[in-house]
């Protein structure tokens, strides 16, 4: 049974998946940092620090107006559309940052594939000899 588990765990697909999950988690942290530390402050500055997360519609007369969303939920039923707007905006920004990163990676890969392979020195020398011999008349 241990040998069978060893075969399963060390198969290429399982190892590739594990590497992908680990890299994905690390990449997710980078993207989240870009969103929270770079893009959201800019959006906050543009909107004057507007916080959508406290926008809600009270469904109960028990809910006092002007309360933060968390406190309003404790008093009664509310539709918290502000939190939905915040998460939707966050998703759009994450998707855009991911698009920019993947676009940059694709451009780097494209630039890398466009580089012509350098001809090895021995092949270059043989080509020169061939060209010289081709210009000489045959006897």
UniProtKB/Swiss-Prot annotation:
Channel that opens in response to stretch forces in the membrane lipid bilayer. May participate in the regulation of osmotic pressure changes within the cell. PROSITE patterns: MSCL. This is Large-conductance mechanosensitive channel. Homopentamer. Gene3D superfamilies: Large-conductance mechanosensitive channel, MscL, domain 1 (1.10.1200.120). Keywords: Cell inner membrane, Cell membrane, Ion channel, Ion transport, Membrane, Transmembrane, Transmembrane helix, Transport. GO terms for cellular component: plasma membrane. NCBIfam families: mscL (TIGR00220), PRK00567.1-4 (NF001843), PRK13952.1 (NF010557). The gene is mscL.
């Amino acid at each position: 049974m241990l040998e069978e588990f060893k075969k399963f765990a060390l198969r290429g697909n399982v190892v590739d998946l594990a590497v992908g999950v680990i890299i994905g988690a690390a990449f997710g942290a980078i993207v989240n940092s870009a969103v929270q530390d770079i893009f959201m402050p800019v959006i906050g500055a543009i909107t004057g620090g507007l916080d959508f997360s406290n926008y809600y519609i009270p469904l109960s007369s028990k809910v006092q107006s002007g309360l933060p969303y968390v406190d309003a939920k404790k008093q009664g039923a509310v539709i918290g559309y502000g939190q939905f707007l915040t998460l939707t905006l966050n998703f759009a920004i994450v998707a855009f940052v991911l698009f920019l990163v993947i676009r940059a990676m694709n451009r780097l890969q494209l630039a890398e594939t466009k580089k012509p392979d350098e001809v090895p020195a021995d092949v270059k020398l043989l080509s020169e000899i061939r060209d010289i011999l081709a210009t000489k008349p045959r006897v």
